[in-house]
């Protein structure tokens, strides 16, 4: 089981990265450019984390490819699951 999860809300030019530990501690919550070097830098900071994206094709493909190239476990969170998870939090729950 990974020590942390890197959740990426993927976008065309940049993604929002949130890194959380198993205990729920947020280690990072910041944008990361959708470029190989920027993604590699993020993944290099947390090499043992599980990478999860909310879109696996097109704009999410580079993030998945770079995570796998770094030897990291990577997964896709389908839309219905993301929507269900967003409902767990109070306030505005926006899902793509």
Please tell me what each predicted stretch does.
Residues 1-96:
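Phosphate- and other anionic-substrate recognition elements at nucleic-acid/protein interfaces
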């Amino acid at each position: 089981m990974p020590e942390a999860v890197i959740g990426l809300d993927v976008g065309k030019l940049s993604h929002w990265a949130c890194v959380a530990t198993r205990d729920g501690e947020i280690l990072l919550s910041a944008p990361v450019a959708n470029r190989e070097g920027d993604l590699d830098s993020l993944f290099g900071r947390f090499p043992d984390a599980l990478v999860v994206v909310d879109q696996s094709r097109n704009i999410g493909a580079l993030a998945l490819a770079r995570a796998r190239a770094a030897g990291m476990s990577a997964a896709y969170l389908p839309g219905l699951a993301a929507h269900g998870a967003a409902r767990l939090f109070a306030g505005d729950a926006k899902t793509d």
